[in-house]
Amino acid sequence: MGEKRGVMFSDGKVWFEQRRFSIRNLKVLGWGGQTMEQMILEDAQNFTKFIERKCKNGNINNMKTFTSLAVLNSLWSIIKGSRYDLESGDPKVMKTLETMNRAVKNSNVTGGILNHLPFLRHVAPKFSGYDELNERLNKTWIFFADEVTRHKDSWQPGIRRDFIDVYLEEIEARKNDPTSTFNEMQLVALLKDFFAAGIDTTSNSIEFTIGYMTVCPDIQDKVQAELDKVIGKDNLPSLAFRNSLPYLNAVLKEVLRISNIGPTTIPHRATVDSTFMGYEIKKNYTVLPNLMSVHMDKEHWGDPEAFRPERFIDEHGEFVNDPWLIPFGSGRRKCLGETLAKNTHFLFVVCLLQKFRFKLPNGQAPPSMLGKDGFTMSAPEFDIVVTPR
């Protein structure tokens, strides 16, 4: 068994120390605060302007890479101290995003056939997809390792430009501790975790939302009427408006429920023998909480296959949460980036629906909104006509 790295696929001391360090220092650098909100809003506005220029050239089909880059900027400015332009983009970053998007689409959270029949990587590495997946993961690892190397070359103790600098400082402080879990390999793994988990799920949330607004124009009308009344078409949105937008909140929650972007959590490992609800779970068993089964439970939701935001609206027209909605998991292993994901989803969707009307091309029947299976569920791709409001 190899060294446990990062926070997504580790447990025990490694997971506890790496997660605690990450949360504490990301908050110091602006994570979850007003600074982060301002960065997200700037990225959302830039993305809106980009879409406005893009839609002049015709229908928009796949916004995946551009949405991912726009969502990446807020997080990446804290992680490595720089941002990227949507128009030109950084070729290496764009290539890494494309590589990771393909890896996510071509695998699933259990590891697919390789997880159930691991010997296939030796007897049929090409047929099983092991060669292709391994190549993409290696390219992604090299991208982040190179970023750490560039930071080391210009790093000065005591000067904290970003998260990478803070982590390098921690490595230096613990270099004489043989039990330390802080090293460059761990840093690269953390960066990959932040990049993969935060970017893919959030960009998919935005794309699913725009997709549902496109195929459900009556719901789009209601959301835009609420936005016009509460914020206006030309005023800057902010998180302070969130509690005054019950219908939009209901729509965003319903998107997360029905799209099941993370159909399960990431794999967990049982660290001790235990019994749960009569089931015996042995030490080292892999446990996958099935979030989709909760979100699509017919007894609880009644009509889980229907996109119906009103299930989150009470008789007084107010938004009500439902404890059965757990897209970020629950407990101590809950998603590290939940706050960032929710804030980004909200501000991006508000900016887009303030400025644009989304509809299907004339004569096109509404497509299925069933997601594409992979490590996460990806929004379906279809032509969308985007017009300024």
Give residue spans per PLM region.
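Cytochrome P450 heme-thiolate monooxygenase catalytic core
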Residues: 13-14, 33-206, 222
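Conserved, non-catalytic sequence blocks in retroelement Pol enzymes and Pol-derived host proteins
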Residues: 9-13, 28-36, 61, 87, ...
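Conserved cytochrome P450 K-helix/beta-meander segment immediately N-terminal to the heme-binding cysteine loop
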Residues: 289-317
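C-terminal helix/juxtamembrane-tail motif
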Residues: 165-169, 286, 357, 374-389
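Cytochrome P450 heme-thiolate "Cys pocket" and heme-binding signature region
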Residues: 192, 277, 315-345, 370-372
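Cytochrome P450 heme-binding "Cys pocket" and the immediately downstream C-terminal segment
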Residues: 217-219, 287, 339-377
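Short, small-residue alpha-helix embedded
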Residues: 202-213, 348
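Conserved cytochrome P450 K-helix E-x-x-R motif and the immediately C-terminal K′/meander segment
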Residues: 142, 236-278, 298
